[in-house]
Regions:
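Beta-strand-rich domains and repeat architectures in extracellular enzymes and scaffolds
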Residues: 55-84, 106
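Conserved beta-strand positions in repeat-built beta-propeller and related beta-rich domains
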Residues: 78-83, 120-126, 167-171, 226-231, ...
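Surface-exposed loop and turn segments in beta-propeller and other repeat-based domains
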Residues: 32-61, 100-104, 140-150, 187-210, ...
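C-terminal motif of bacterial Sec signal peptides marking the signal peptidase cleavage site
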Residues: 15-18
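Short loop/turn segments that connect beta-strands within beta-propeller blades
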Residues: 89-94, 132-136, 179-183, 238-243, ...
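Short coil/turn segments that connect the beta-strands within blades of beta-propeller domains
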Residues: 73-74, 115-117, 162-164, 221-223, ...
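Repeated scaffold domains used in trafficking and secretory/extracellular systems
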Residues: 63-68, 106-112, 150-158, 208-219, ...
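Blade-level signature of beta-propeller repeat domains, shared across WD40, Kelch, NHL, RCC1
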Residues: 311-350
Length: 350
């Protein structure tokens, strides 16, 4: 019996051994156990990169002198003074799309799109030309195109709202305001002025505002702003005050020798804006909140870019923002820079 039990026990052990495939090994590799951490601080480092230019070559060899521009988010309108036209580019790719002009009269110094219409300040031709924004057809003009009858002289700057058109030129020391509801786009001329907004002793063509330079006006928030870059002067009026009080709309004037703004661009955020300005003798492209801009608080921009050994910035540039890209006028070319970020992270274990 005992012999049989021993044989049965040995058989069971052999059967169990044949079923157990587990191998036992000594593991010597290092084991890393992830340790939870917290991000304490993210320090953004924004910079300009990815430069792109457009020149006369992109226009088929036609002259390019980018005096001013306007971006509606889909199309970029460029006042091409040398080309005597407005050139239209795709705002995202900067591919050339089409041109519009009224013969040789479109000596474009500025351009502004609002609603169905495009307004073009036609320089020494003493008129603001009005085009159909979609078809490019010339419709009419503000002024008469001849001195002294025209209420518009050598034009350097134009801006518009759904109700009004604002014009700065060399005729008077004021901004001429035209009522869009009173315009007759089937007429040759529209010469009736709705209001005149005083700009002190400043006018385009004066020693502080040479005719050959570029200027900007824009409606930001509820107000119209006009910039005199050489003196650091900013004029502003509330648009509703202009409609209600016309010539007597209250004026706000600020002057700064430290911050001299030349142009401003809206962004995709109604509470943020980019400006081109002169600070400490250097051109800066800076982003500000609406509140800081309205308060003329330019000391602490949200983001700021200056020229360096990689980035060259034009001295009198007009700026347009397009989805984290900055488009700049630069004489015989358009420049575009991408805004990029290389953030740094400060972390610690939990």
């Amino acid at each position: 019996m005992r012999k049989n039990m021993i044989m049965i026990g040995a058989g069971m052990m052999l059967a169990l051994a044949s079923c157990d495939k587990t191998e036992i090994r000594e593991i010597t590799e290092d084991r890393v156990v992830p340790q939870p951490v917290d991000t304490i601080k993210v320090a953004d480092h924004f910079y300009l990169d990815g430069h792109l230019s457009r020149t006369a070559e992109d226009l088929g060899g036609r002259p390019l002198d980018a005096a001013n521009l306007f971006n509606d988010g889909e199309e970029l309108y460029v006042a091409n003074f040398a080309g005597k036209c407005v050139d239209v580019f795709d705002a995202e790719t900067l591919e050339f799309k089409r041109s519009m002009s009224n013969g040789d009269r479109t000596l474009a110094r500025d351009v502004y799109a609002e609603g169905d219409h495009l307004f073009v300040a036609a320089g020494e031709n003493q008129e603001v030309q009005i085009f159909d924004r979609k078809t490019g057809k010339y419709l009419s003009r503000l002024g008469t195109g001849s001195w002294p009858a025209s209420m518009i002289s050598k034009v350097g700057c134009v801006c518009a709202t759904p109700r009004l058109v604002f014009v700065r030129d060399s005729k008077y020391t004021n901004i001429r305001v035209f009522d869009r509801e009173a315009l007759n786009l089937g007429a040759a001329n529209n010469n009736k002025v709705f209001a005149k907004l005083s700009t002190g002793g400043d006018f385009i063509g004066s020693s502080n505002e040479p005719l050959g330079e570029s200027y900007d006006m824009e409606v930001i928030g509820d107000s119209l702003y006009a910039f005199i870059p050489r003196t650091g002067t900013i004029y502003s009026w509330k648009v509703e005050d202009i409609i209600q009080q016309k010539d007597y709309a209250p004026l706000k004037v600020s002057r700064s020798q430290e911050f001299k703004l030349r142009s401003i661009s809206k962004t995709g955020d109604k509470d943020k804006f980019f400006v081109s300005m002169l600070k400490d003798g250097k051109i800066q492209l800076a982003e500000y909140s609406l509140a800081d801009f309205q308060a003329r608080n330019f000391a602490n921009p949200l983001r700021c870019f200056t020229a360096d050994d990689r980035v060259l910035l034009p001295s009198q540039t007009i700026i347009a923002y397009q989805k984290e890209k900055l488009i700049l006028t630069n004489g015989a070319k358009l420049d575009r820079w991408d805004i990029r970020n290389n953030p740094a992270y400060e972390i610690k274990p939990r």
